[in-house]
Design a protein with these regions (language model features):
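Cytosolic regulatory regions of ion transport systems
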Residues: 1-117
């Protein structure tokens, strides 16, 4: 990501990037979250696995174990207040689609989703 910012002629310090929620802390989600953190972006990491949440806790701004297929869980976390959410649930396509649908219903403005079928 830093290379992209340099290519645009901007420094990381000159760009105010709002916090990002990353849902799914597997290989892709955790790598993406680490890269965002390395570039000064605050990251809330959410995963259904408490083990993954514990493993990522030292590296992210905040981590939470939650079932994101449950719209009430997303509401309780205040996810609708964040501008950008990345859905990185790769191994369960149905969960990824349901989570993305819940985010749309909550009015999240910018949703990026990755899924493997």
């Amino acid at each position: 990501m830093a290379n992209i910012l340099k290519a645009l002629g901007r420094s990381r310090a000159g760009i105010d990037i709002p916090p990002v929620v990353v849902i799914g802390l597997g290989r892709f989600g955790s790598s993406l979250a680490h890269e965002l953190m390395a570039n000064g972006v605050e990251v809330l990491g959410i995963d259904s696995s408490e083990k993954r949440v514990r493993e990522e806790a030292p590296y992210l701004t905040e981590t939470i174990a939650a079932d994101t297929t449950d719209p009430e869980a997303l509401r309780q976390l205040g996810v609708e207040e964040v501008e950008r959410v990345i859905v990185a649930i790769g191994s369960h396509l149905e969960d990824s689609i349901l989570t993305a649908s819940n985010l749309v219903e909550l009015g999240v403005k910018d949703i990026w989703a990755k899924a493997d079928s």
